A protein has these predicted regions:
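Nudix hydrolase/Nudix homology domain
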Residues: 2-3, 31-33, 70, 111-192
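N-terminal amphipathic/basic-hydrophobic helices that include classical n-h-c signal peptides
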Residues: 1-9
């Protein structure tokens, strides 16, 4: 049901997530798969890495992922472990998933609830981080099957024309990513 029993995938499925309320206040923890089956609101993170040309690094989720396998999404998506904040989790997961290290900046947060496949509900309070690097990724094959760079205008058109190729959370937050990226890139230019 959840792919092969590769140790990385098995460990990920048996991890616990941080349950939160609508204000992102911790209300408990739950086994990751149980939280997704029951549709419990939990803390998550999404990392968006751009190159110096402003192109977004996308990953194609590995086909054996427990949901949304084969779909294109942002650079890195995950959950903090109990006792871990989202910034630390983002800095842990980016190299684990994509073999990248770079400075991350908090961009925004959003909440969404979507059934991503039969029996799996993503109900997340998602913390979004941006980073910039021209270093090419070295994806972990258990996490990402492929990667590509797209400018935000091209991605916007493809999201409209081929929505089934992309994860639900990317489609939901894309408009906010675009507006937040303008602010982020302006701040980067001012710092140079």
């Amino acid at each position: 049901l959840f792919g092969d029993n590769d140790n990385n995938e098995y460990m990920e499925i048996n991890e616990h997530v941080i349950l939160v309320d609508e204000s992102d206040q911790i209300v408990g923890t739950m086994e990751k798969m149980e939280a997704h089956v029951k549709g419990k609101l939990h803390r998550a993170l999404s990392v968006f890495i751009f190159n110096s040309r402003g192109e977004l690094l996308l990953q194609q989720r590995a086909p054996e992922k427990y949901h949304s396998g084969g779909k294109w999404t942002n650079t890195c998506c995950s959950h903090p472990r109990p006792g871990e904040d989202t910034f630390a989790a983002a800095n842990r997961r980016l190299p684990e998933e994509m073999g990248l290290h770079c400075s991350l900046t908090f961009a925004f947060s959003f909440t969404y609830c979507k059934t991503v496949q039969k029996g799996i509900i993503e109900y997340e309070y998602d913390h979004v981080y941006f980073g910039t690097t021209d270093v090419l990724p070295s994806p972990n094959a258990a996490e990402a099957a492929a990667f590509r760079y797209l400018d935000l205008g091209t991605l916007e058109v493809d999201l409209e024309n081929n929505p089934d190729h992309y994860t639900e959370w990317l489609k939901i937050c894309f408009t906010q990513v675009k507006s937040s990226y303008r602010q982020y890139s302006n701040q980067l230019n001012l710092a140079r």
